[in-house]
Amino acid sequence: MAAAAGRSLLLLLCSRGGGGGAGGCGALTAGCFPGLGVSRHRPHQQHRTAHQRPASWQSVGAAYCSTVVPSDDVTVVYQNGLPVISVRLPSRRERCQFTLKPISDSVGVFLRQLQEEDRGIDRVAIYSPDGVRVAASTGIDLLLLDDFKLVINDLTYHVRPPKRDLLSHEDAATLNDVKTLVQQLYTTLCIEQHQLNKERELVERLEDLKQQLAPLEKVRIEISRKAEKRTTLVLWGGLAYMATQFGILARLTWWEYSWDIMEPVTYFITYGSAMAMYAYFVMTRQEYVYPEARDRQYLLFFHKGAKKSRFDLEKYNQLKDAIAQAEMDLKRLRDPLQVHLPLRQIGEKE
């Protein structure tokens, strides 16, 4: 079409040129329209030039192709207090509505919903009107306060959300109270199911821990029985030693010698016993008290037996601690105060 318009203008100028003839027309054409000048070369060169010109026009047309689409393809309306964004998806060219929660949802949630709805979307992002990219963590309520650009693949949508009046301080405080009440209501309604799931999880954990502990517990009971037996023998041996010492001193005092001779002997025996108790304190850093001495002797025999039997005492202690912690958590979970029961129900359960 541009070539036809050029030829018409050329014929008009030539007809007005008069005496210039073909030469004048050719000069005028070459000077004013170099792209449409009449060539004096051979016909086949002119034919080649005519085939090369449309390629340059096509390249120019592709370079200035616009990717901005009208804003009507993306609309934002409020339904029941929630923003509903309608977007024309690129794959099937059909509109799809996305209902968002202004408080809990973010820009990242909206972008993920777009990609999940249309698998043909390779790149999607949101930019501010001045070209700054909006972070995925930005809330929907903040995004809808101003205009923004939605970029889907190579298409850019200018979105103009409807303006809404900002809440006053009193309305915002009332809204926060309503949110708190809704959260408490949700917790009250769902706490029973949560309690059951948590209790089932703790019971399963207890069963698993007890199964792991069962073989170790059998070995521990056997080692403990042997250590208890040896400790009892030591205690009875101490009593037998004291009885034997008493009999020997009585024999020497009343039958063999007199008290005047045995009195210094008993003094040194008593002082030697005091030295032995002090040596026990120096070695063990514990006072020589019979129950503590007995427990210490029991532990010595137990650790010797565990080492001899290759009993994994560290693993046993870890399992016992885990079981105790799980039982404590289960008891705390079943506590009426933790499930927000009224005081009257607590009194009835007691």
From Swiss-Prot:
Spans annotated as Juxtamembrane helix: 284-289
Residue stretches spanning the membrane: 233-256, 265-282
Domain of life per record: Eukaryota
Listed GO biological process terms: calcium import into the mitochondrion; calcium-mediated signaling; cell migration; cell population proliferation; cellular response to calcium ion starvation; generation of precursor metabolites and energy; glucose homeostasis; mitochondrial calcium ion transmembrane transport
Record note on modification: Phosphorylation by CaMK2 in heart leads to increased MCU current. The regulation of MCU by CaMK2 is however subject to discussion: another group was unable to reproduce these results. Phosphorylated on tyrosines by PTK2B/PYK2, promoting oligomerization.
GO cellular component assignments: calcium channel complex; mitochondrial inner membrane; mitochondrion; uniplex complex
Effect of residue 256 to V: Strongly reduces calcium channel activity
Modified residues (Phosphoserine): 56, 91
InterPro entries from the UniProt entry: MCU_C, MCU_fam
Pfam families xref list: MCU
Modified residues (S-glutathionyl cysteine): 96
Outcome of gene disruption: No visible phenotype. Although slightly smaller, mice are grossly normal. Only minor alterations in basal energetics are observed. Cells show a strong reduction, but not a complete absence, of mitochondrial matrix calcium. The skeletal muscles exhibit alterations in the phosphorylation and activity of pyruvate dehydrogenase and mice show defects in ability to perform strenuous work. Mitochondria lack evidence for calcium-induced permeability transition pore (PTP) opening.
Localization: Mitochondrion inner membrane
Transit peptide, from-to: 1-49
Reaction catalyzed: Ca(2+)(in) = Ca(2+)(out)
Tissue distribution of the protein: Detected in heart muscle (at protein level). Expressed in skeletal muscle, heart, kidney, liver, brain, lung, white fat and spleen.
Principal subcellular localisation of the protein: mitochondrion
Modified residues (N6-acetyllysine): 331
Membrane topology: Multi-pass membrane protein
Positions contributing to Ca(2+) binding: 263
Residue ranges, Mitochondrial intermembrane side: 257-264
Activity regulation (UniProt): MCU channel activity is regulated by the heterodimer composed of MICU1 and either MICU2 or MICU3, which act as calcium-sensors. At low calcium levels, MICU1 occludes the pore of the MCU channel, preventing mitochondrial calcium uptake. At higher calcium levels, calcium-binding to MICU1 and MICU2 (or MICU3) induces a conformational change that weakens MCU-MICU1 interactions and moves the MICU1-MICU2 heterodimer away from the pore, allowing calcium permeation through the channel. MCU channel activity is gated by EMRE/SMDT1 via the juxtamembrane helix loop.
Domain notes: The selectivity filter, in which calcium ions are arranged in single file, is composed of two acidic rings separated by one helical turn along the central axis of the channel pore.
Protein name per Swiss-Prot or TrEMBL: Calcium uniporter protein, mitochondrial
Species in which this protein is naturally found: Mus musculus (Mouse)
Name of the gene this protein is made from: Mcu
